[in-house]
Design a protein with these regions (language model features):
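A conserved nucleotide-sugar
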Residues: 140-156
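Active-site and donor-binding regions of nucleotide-sugar-utilizing enzymes
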Residues: 1-110, 124-135, 146, 156-158, ...
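Nucleotide-activated donor-binding/catalytic signature segment of Leloir-type glycosyltransferases, i.e.
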Residues: 163-178
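Phosphate/pyrophosphate-binding betaalpha-module
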Residues: 135, 140-141, 159, 167
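A donor-sugar binding/catalytic signature common to diverse glycosyltransferases
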Residues: 176-202
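Charged active-site motifs of nucleotide-sugar-dependent glycosyltransferases
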Residues: 115-122, 149-150
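Glycine-rich phosphate-binding loop signature in dinucleotide/nucleotide-binding domains
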Residues: 12-17, 114-117, 185
């Protein structure tokens, strides 16, 4: 399937012959597309750098050879690429900006009917049904060993609130679209990988 999609995109690229190919994230696929484009003399712009600083720094040379202009969303990525003589553009990060502007509310416990005397463990299972179904049961399975805490799940309103009833247990509460507030009041957090990890770290 992967190779089929790659071949189809290559055919479309050749047929359309754009001046610039703009790629977004998804390194496994897009670095291959970047190579195909460069071989055909098409400029390549890339938004959201592959996380090569974390898993394979030797691939910087591959990026330099295939990408004409890289737009990064993490400030330290600029410095990382500079070490290899590759200039990139910091495009900013909506999540980092939102966290910087956020101010915790004083009535979080009262508004959500939480116990102000019991520390919170925040549970961030993601925002898509598939990842929630894969992760949330596993996350809340540890609850019996932490009775002195209240587990609060960060729900999202793009899903039907009734959907979360599948995960109701004694000792588990849900709040919706209040992730930053929840994290700011939590003692610890269980987090699915992805944007939520960045939100928690910030």
């Amino acid at each position: 399937k992967f190779r089929g999609y790659l071949k189809q995109c290559e055919q479309d690229l050749v047929a359309y012959a754009p001046d610039v190919l703009i790629l977004v994230d998804y390194a496994g696929f897009n670095l291959r597309m970047a190579k195909i484009a460069k071989e055909r003399g098409i400029k390549v712009f890339y938004y959201i750098s592959p996380k090569i600083w974390a898993w394979n720094q030797s691939r910087v040379e591959q990026v330099k050879a295939r990408v004409d202009r890289m737009f990064v969303i993490l400030p330290f990525e600029e410095e990382f690429y500079q070490k290899f003589g590759y200039a990139v553009d910091y495009a900013g990060n909506p999540t980092a900006d939102a966290v910087a502007e956020f101010e915790p509310t004083n009535d979080f416990f009262e508004r959500n009917r939480l116990d102000a005397n019991k520390p919170i463990i925040a549970v961030l299972p993601g925002s898509r049904k598939q990842e929630i179904e894969e992760m949330l049961h596993e996350m809340i399975a540890i609850l019996p060993g932490f009775q002195e805490y209240q587990f609060v799940v960060a729900g999202v309103t793009n899903l039907d609130p009734n959907y979360y009833r599948n995960f109701h247990r004694n000792g588990i509460r849900f709040v919706f679209d209040q992730t930053f507030d929840l994290l700011s009041h939590a003692r610890a957090a269980l987090v699915t990988s992805g944007t939520a990890t960045l939100e928690t770290a910030l």
